[in-house]
Amino acid sequence: MTHISNNRPRIAVIGGGIAGLTVAASLLRAGIECTVYEQATVFADAGAGIQIAPNSARILHRLGLAGALERRATRAHAIETRRWQDGAPLARTELGEPCVERYGAPYYLIQRADLHRSLLELLPPGVVRHSAACTAVEERPDGVTLRFADGTSEEAGVVVGADGIHSALRNHLVGDRPRFSGHTVHRGLVAADRLPSLFEVPKVLFWLGPNGHVTSYPIAQHGLVHFSAVITSPEWDPEVWSAPSRPGEAAAAFAGWNAEVAELIGAAEQAHHWALFDRDCVGGWSTGRMTLAGDAAHPMVPYLSQGANQAIEDAWVLADLLGAADLDPGPALRRYEELRLPRVREVHRRSRERGHEFHLPDGPQQRLRDRSMPTAERLDDYAWIYGFEAAPVGSR
């Protein structure tokens, strides 16, 4: 059992999603007391799939989740990219054992709720407080007061905002607004037995086409297949973030695509339609006693499948630095932002670029992209992501 030091300031984590729970688990492992304040009354026991790449899988293993991931997740054998019209192969990235040998961990496919449950199991009872919507923070030289929607307040030595792209703490610290990317996504789950030939071997499939792309992979423990169908949508009500997909809406958006895509989308009993937002990747989200993590700090479009992975990296680096800090957390929080900002800026930039590349209309640029893909999508080409070691101090 990790010894909790009484000499360090208690940390309040706002938000109990993947980012918040990983921050809490990492802090506790570093011997730092923390409380997670979650606005929901209960955690949802559902959700779409999520890809856990080796860069964050190694961290989850260090936190003690190797067994849970092997039980609840699927190891992907490959990432395959295909053409929208006829399903012709464009590229294949070998994963499986080559990935473990090269990067020290598998590439996992898991339902978001299962990863969330696994992280929650690392936390002692009482660490997470539900129905705790933080509405305001007041920072002082010696601490922070948190005020909640029910009129109560709490004191903390440090506050970490892990409350997602809608982050109230982000609004307090930075003051910018989310930016609509021009893309929306239909996400859904399909019973795997309705697609028997598509995933005989567990893998991630991409189909690229004009103004859109489709991603799909199995979530084997539940006998499900996840899909995300992204389309260019110049117009979207900025006040609406998501809504149930109307019957036939996703199928109509991808009419004319190959039979595999039609079968996949057509097999979904229900889907949800989301607008994809991000923000410019700017700094200034750390003060002497407050900072951000995950989408609150650096929301990004999902075209490198790195959003949650970067949140997990954030958590490990932040806890590593605070675990080595003295009673003044300010230098550790500033160093955390200094270390993370170049990394997340690069992932953020390349994610935006990849969205443009994925959606090229048929023509000279698309043909150039397709010709270059076999030599640009090899396992070694992802070393900058998968091989990144998020451990600045190395004390753990």
UniProtKB/Swiss-Prot annotation:
Catalytic reaction list: 3-amino-4-hydroxybenzoate + NADPH + O2 + H(+) = 3-amino-2,4-dihydroxybenzoate + NADP(+) + H2O
Gene3D superfamilies hit by this protein: FAD/NAD(P)-binding domain (3.50.50.60)
Pathway stated in the Swiss-Prot or TrEMBL entry: Antibiotic biosynthesis
Keywords: Antibiotic biosynthesis, FAD, Flavoprotein, Monooxygenase, NADP, Oxidoreductase
EC number in record: 1.14.13.249
One of the protein's GO biological processes: antibiotic biosynthetic process
Enzyme class, UniProt record, top EC level: oxidoreductase
Cofactor note: Binds 1 FAD molecule per subunit.
Family annotation (Pfam families): FAD_binding_3
Region span, Disordered: 352-371
Binding site for FAD: A19, E38, Q39, R112, D295
Function: Part of a gene cluster involved in the biosynthesis of thioplatensimycin (thioPTM) and platensimycin (PTM), potent and selective inhibitors of bacterial and mammalian fatty acid synthases. Catalyzes the hydroxylation of 3-amino-4-hydroxybenzoate (3,4-AHBA) to 3-amino-2,4-dihydroxybenzoate (3,2,4-ADHBA).
Protein family membership: Belongs to the 6-hydroxynicotinate 3-monooxygenase family.
Protein name: 3-amino-4-hydroxybenzoate 2-monooxygenase PtmB3
Organism of derivation: Streptomyces platensis
